[in-house]
Amino acid sequence: MADLEEQLSDEEKVRIAAKFIIHAPPGEFNEVFNDVRLLLNNDNLLREGAAHAFAQYNLDQFTPVKIEGYEDQVLITEHGDLGNGKFLDPKNRICFKFDHLRKEATDPRPYEAENAIESWRTSIETALRAYVKEHYPNGVCTVYGKKIDGQQTIIACIESHQFQAKNFWNGRWRSEWKFTISPSATQVVGILKIQVHYYEDGNVQLVSHKDIQDSLTVSNEVQTAKEFIKIVEAAENEYQTAISENYQTMSDTTFKALRRQLPVTRTKIDWNKILSYKIGKEMQNA
C-alpha cells in the first residue's frame, strides 16, 4: 500500500477521491466524504482539488435546500446555477450563495429573472406543486422559465427522497421535464431517475432511468399547466409501476436462483436433533 501511495501523484489521488464523492449514494455524501478524507489524509488538497466534485454531486442529485426566512425548499440544479456559487430561487425571485460541502444557503438577495415567461412559469409551478404534494410526501419541486436558443422554455424539476440509515437503506427520486412555449403544440421531454442503496445484508444498488417524449397542446397558461401535469403523472406512474413489477419478478425468479435451496448434501439439517450430530457434540465440548 505504501508503494502504491508513493506512485500516485496528488492530482491522481484527488481524481480518485472526486470519483468516489460524485458516485456517493443518496443520503451518504457525508459518510463517503469522511472515508475519502481519511484515505487522502490531506484536508487542504481534498477541499481545493475536489471542490468541483462536491458541486457536481449536488447538481446531479437535485439537492434540496432551505433558505432562512422562506417557507419552501428550492432545488440545487444546473438550471438555477448563476455562477460563482450563486443559485436562483425562481419562486421567491431571489438568488443565494450555496456551500456545496455544508449544503447551506446564505445571503439571499432579490433577483429578477425572465419576466416575459413568468406567468407561464408560475402556472406550471402552481400545478406541479399540487401534484408533488399529492404523490411525493417528502417531495420538492422547482420550476424555471428561461430563454434557450431564443425560445421561451419551461424546465420543471422534482426531487423526493427517503433516507433510512437506521434501516440500512436510502433512496432518491428525480425527474426533469422540459418544453418550449410555442403556438398550438410543443414536445415535452422528460427524464426519470431512481437510485436506491440497500446495505444491511449486502451491498445492492438500484440505478435506473427512463427518457420520455410526448406532445403537449399549448393554449392558455392554466389549461396548458393542467395538460402538462397529466403527461407527468401518467409517465411517472407507469415508470414506478414497471419498476415495482420488475422487482417482484426478480424476487420470484432471479434472486431465488442465486441461492441454493439445499446444502451440498441435498438434505436439510434438523436443528432439533443437532446435539445428536457429531458437530453438535464438538460444539458442546468446545
From Swiss-Prot:
Q: Name one Pfam family in it.
A: F-actin_cap_A
What this protein is called in its record is F-actin-capping protein subunit alpha-2
Question: How does this chain assemble?
Answer: Component of the F-actin capping complex, composed of a heterodimer of an alpha and a beta subunit. Component of the WASH complex, composed of F-actin-capping protein subunit alpha (CAPZA1, CAPZA2 or CAPZA3), F-actin-capping protein subunit beta (CAPZB), WASHC1, WASHC2, WASHC3, WASHC4 and WASHC5. Interacts with RCSD1/CAPZIP. Directly interacts with CRACD; this interaction decreases binding to actin.
Record keywords: Acetylation, Actin capping, Actin-binding, Phosphoprotein
Q: Which residues carry this modification: Phosphoserine?
A: S9
> Per the similarity annotation, which family is this?
Belongs to the F-actin-capping protein alpha subunit family.
- Gene name, please? CAPZA2
Q: Which InterPro entries match?
A: CapZ_alpha, CapZ_alpha/beta, CapZ_alpha/beta_2, CapZ_alpha_1, F-actin_cap_asu_CS
Q: Which PROSITE patterns match?
A: F_ACTIN_CAPPING_A_1 (PS00748), F_ACTIN_CAPPING_A_2 (PS00749)
